[in-house]
Structures are given as C-alpha cells and as structure tokens.
Amino acid sequence: IIPKQSGIKVSGHNRSDDLFMFIRKKITGLSPGTQYQLYFEVEMASNVPTNALGVGGAPGESVHLKAGASAKEPVVARDNQNYYRINLDKGNQSVGGADLINIGNIGVTDTTTAYTLIQRSNPTPFSQRTGAEGELWIIIGTDSGFEGLTTLYYSAIKITLQK
C-alpha cells in the first residue's frame, strides 16, 4: 500500500474517547464475488510507551490498530447524532467488527520516548468477499480510547490474499 522509501503520517487529537483514524486503498483485478483470506503485516513508527497513564485510557494500550477489507468503499458521513462515522463495521476500540479486526496496539515499550518502528500482524486469517467486479478496499486504522494527541507514521503495509 505504501510506496518504497516513504510513509504516511496520521495524527489526531481525541477529545471524545472515540477517535478512528484510517487509510484506505482500493485493490482491483481479484476474482469477482470470491471469498479471500487476508493476512496483514503493518509496520509503523510510534513514540508511545506501554504501561503509561492517560485520560480515557493508556496512550499505548488504548489505541488499537485495526486492519480489514470491504467490497464497499469506506467513507465517512455524519450520523443522526451529528457525529462523523465510517460506513463499515469496525467494532469498537479493542473489539473488532465484521469489516476490521484488532491486530494490536501502538505501544512500544515502557521506556519509549523516541519514534520506534513496531510491527503488528494477524496470526489467523481475516475473511472477506470481493465485490461484483473483483474489487476490495483495504483499510488500516487506529481506534482510540486515549483522550489526547496521537501521531503515527505508517512505513510499510503488506497484505497477503488467499482464495
């Protein structure tokens, strides 16, 4: 998903105990209407320590990394309570949903203060069906309960698909 020798910065200040930040990419050329097993390998730079205290939750363990896929394009829209929501089932914070699973958190180590590369992956496959034209949207994001600023840099994302 990410070109070699670059990265993607995501940053947000969570003020409501519920912030979802995500990146997405459409994959085409797959078999139409076919069930695929997906394995995600995400490398990112995080400067967040583990076992730290924070408002709403720990800045490391309360920011959950999620990965998923959908035949439906992920978009954000206002709901009937005037909140912006993604149109997919991402679950909530540590719990995955039908379209995204939890693959870990953004905590590095107890003594972290500098940005450090961390890797997260799913040991068991995530299953999703492609659309009628063989398309699948890949979504990687963080679902945060930590009420504060989170800034991350995605440096590599590898997705393996198996029929």
Residue ranges of model-derived segments:
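Short beta-strand-plus-loop segments that form exposed binding edges in beta-rich domains
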Residues: N102-T124, I138-L149
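Short beta-strands within extracellular/lumenal beta-sheet-rich domains
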Residues: R15-S31, L117-P125, Y154
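Surface-exposed, low-complexity/disordered Ser/Thr/Gly/Pro/Asn-rich loops and linkers
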Residues: I1-F22
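Extended extracellular/luminal ectodomain segments enriched in beta-structured repeat modules
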Residues: D18, G29-Y39, E133
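Beta-strand-rich interaction/scaffold domains
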Residues: H64-T111
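A short beta-strand element within beta-rich, extracytoplasmic domains
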Residues: T34-N51, I140-T142
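Extended, low-complexity, turn-rich repeat/linker tracts enriched in Gly/Pro/Ser/Thr and Asp/Glu
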Residues: M44-E61, E73-P74, F146-L149
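Proprotein-processing/basic-patch segments
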Residues: G134-K163
